[in-house]
Amino acid sequence: MKFLAFGLIYFHFCILNRCEYITSSTIQKCYNSSNEPNNCSQKAVIVLSLENGQIANTEQVVATLNQLSDSGVNKQLQNSFIFEVTKSPVTALFPLIYLQDFNSQPLEQVIATTLFSCKDGFYDSSPTCKFQYDSKGQKILDSQGYCCYCSLSDILGMGNDLSRGKVCYALNLGAGSATAHCLKFSPLWYSAFKIQQYQLYFEVNINIYTVDSQNQKNLKQTLKLSTSNPTMKSSDNSTISKIIGTFTPTQPPADLSSYYLVKPSFPATDPRVLQGISSWMFVDKTMFTLDGTQCNKIGVSYSGFRQQSSSCSQPVGSCLQNQLENLYQSDLILLSQNKQPKYLLESQGNFNQVQFQGQTILQQGLSGSASTLITIEIDAAQIKFVTNLGIGCISQCSINNFESHSGNGKLVALVQNQGNYSAEFVLGFNCSSNVQPIQGQKLFLTANQLYNFNCSVSVNSDISAINNNCTINLYDAIGNQLDSKNILFNTTSTNHTSNQGNNTGQQQSSQEYKSSQSCSDKCSSFWSFWCYFSAGCIKEAFKSIASIAGVASALALVIFLAKNGYLVPIIRFLCCCCCKSKKKENEKNKDKTDKKSIQESCSYDRSCCSHSISQSYQVENKNKYKRSKIQRSFSSESCQDKSKKIINELSNLEETFEANKLYANIDKNSSIFEYFGFKKSFTFILYERNDILFLPQNSTILDMIGALQPQKGSYLAQKFLEIVNKNALKVVSTSPLYLLIE
């Protein structure tokens, strides 16, 4: 077995004309196969770490074999080998599986009609909305829409509920008393795709050159590695190249497992279809209804529209919210405000559509580090590793002012390679403590290339801050700082909002959703007995008919009573009974209060009545009804006669004192004489304590008080005034009215 002796292996790091050499070692490798047992040869193994996005000549491996040792004799080789290795950008490939098509914007058409002409039955020959037919010419179930009718209360002018798409007028049975509601679809349709698990993909190209004695470089062959073909061998078996593995990207691909990809598909001439990938969207799976039975979801069908709960008491379009057109337009508004969209592809990263192995693939370009290890096994003696160190600068950089936690902060920087070679650069970031760390980025720029770098910026605090700062540093491939810029920016405090009330923390009442439709859900009005019949709700239909018959009978009875003159007397009788009952109760309560007030407030010492003699007598109601016992105690006949006289005179006011009941009694503990009169026009109460008569204040008594002044008061008041003057009663107080017996 022969062993080949190697010289030193050199790695060259070249910046223009300046080079730096680092020594390396070699290894021995033996291959044992059944064809050539114990066939060992000396191999030089080069292990390279290739970064994401490297371009031609950014990283170059030059291997030169210049001498061998054979039986202790060193021999110089005339030809050498050169290997150039490049790596394509790392991308994530998302296979797509077609799901189904969805309309961009379903619309509701409202047709005004009458109670008797609106038709929505499946077996109607010509329903108001017309039938839609499938590709086989069969009627599509529920494509005939549905009808909404003005209820009986609306026709009678008593309805106040929301009516879908119609304005109901009293006594209107013609046009406008019913409406037909039809589901129509807009011309634009989207195709939806399931998104499969991503796979990382990149390619590594290895160019093998031979260099002759005239130092001419000739391409010998090219090896092309990829994630699909990780191992390749040269045609002369002198070189073997392998992909060992790829490190997990520092910025991994987006997680799209909970989304569908939707893209405008037809008509092909639609402007949005022609826009291409810029109008594609990622939409959460929960926003779709695949069977079309759910309202306010993408994919709502004729059945979902027609069978919606309480349809005729909902606003027009209530079942057709949150459609693809709504999502697209909302993102356009966000973009116009320089905000991040929610559904367009750029909300998740940088995406493109590619055809890969005959399959439609969604491709996402990855930024950040994604190193790949490869090995190249060669029969070489000396290896040079060349890395171009670029000269660059940061020409512009800025961070916009933004709201904390809004996700709208953005850093923009222009980086230029000022050298004559393609080179690797590194951007590093050092920001103030309240700014979330920004991940460093590796850039691979061609000669004199100007690159626009941007990334998101966020802060950790909810409160506003002035003069936040970030420093951007530009380094070359081995960490030499080439340029540095400092950026100042401001943030405003987080604007807290809530959809559950006017302010954060407010709560609205919870809503309960039914999983199945009841009869009341199917028919919007209790009076729509024809709706109950059509829905199979027989019991509710008969209840509705009985209620309508009851209301009609009551109306007929009222009309009959009014026509024959019975209605007004009945109403007066009922009102009179009600008012009397309430009036008696109020007077009883008021009497007790007035009586107590007199007992507490009256302080007169004069007395024409004492408690030494007790006598009983009766006063007969002049209007023929009842007798009541009056128990009085008097010390003199004149006091008794005078009080009795006053009572009789008050009772003789026949014009107004048409009492149904008169009674009087004496409270033995307080010596209060009470005179009650229950009249049609007012309640009259007269108290006597010692020598004071009291009349509770009301409208009639006020009228009497007014009669104490000349030329004022009603007829009743004038009569009352005559009694006051005739019996020489002295007015002590007018509010309430106190009369003193002289």
Swiss-Prot record:
Membrane-spanning segments: 541-561
UniProt membrane topology term: Single-pass type I membrane protein
Membrane side Cytoplasmic: residue ranges: 562-742
Entry-linked Pfam families: HAP2-GCS1
Tagged with keyword Transmembrane: yes
InterPro entries referenced in this protein's UniProt entry, alphabetically: HAP2/GCS1 (IPR040326), HAP2/GCS1_dom (IPR018928)
GO molecular function: fusogenic activity; lipid binding
One Gene Ontology CC term in the entry: cell-cell junction
Top-level taxon of origin: Eukaryota
Keyword Transmembrane helix: yes
Region (Important for membrane fusion): 152-179
Topology Extracellular: residue spans: 20-540
Disulfide bonds: C30-C40, C118-C147, C129-C182, C148-C312, C150-C168, C295-C319, C431-C470
GO biological process: fertilization; plasma membrane fusion; single fertilization
Signal peptide: 1-19
UniProt subcellular location: Cell membrane; Cell junction
Keyword field: Cell junction, Cell membrane, Disulfide bond, Fertilization, Lipid-binding, Membrane, Signal, Transmembrane, Transmembrane helix
Free-text comment on this protein's domains from its UniProt entry: The region that is important for membrane fusion binds to lipids and can insert itself into lipid membranes. It is unstructured in an aqueous environment and assumes a more ordered, beta-stranded conformation in the presence of lipid membranes.
Family statement drawn from the similarity comment of this UniProt entry: Belongs to the HAP2/GCS1 family.
Note: HAP2/GCS1 family members mediate membrane fusion between gametes in a broad range of eukaryotes, ranging from algae and higher plants to protozoans and cnidaria, suggesting they are derived from an ancestral gamete fusogen. They function similar to viral fusogens, by inserting part of their extracellular domain into the lipid bilayer of an adjoining cell.
General function of this protein: During fertilization, required for the formation of intercellular membrane pores and subsequent exchange of gametic pronuclei between cells. Probably initiates the formation of intercellular membrane pores by inserting part of its extracellular domain into the cell membrane of the adjoining cell in the mating pair. Mating requires the presence of HAP2 on at least one of the two cells. Mating efficiency is high when HAP2 is present on both cells, and is strongly reduced when HAP2 is present on only one of the two cells.
Protein name: Hapless 2
Organism annotation: Tetrahymena thermophila
Gene: HAP2
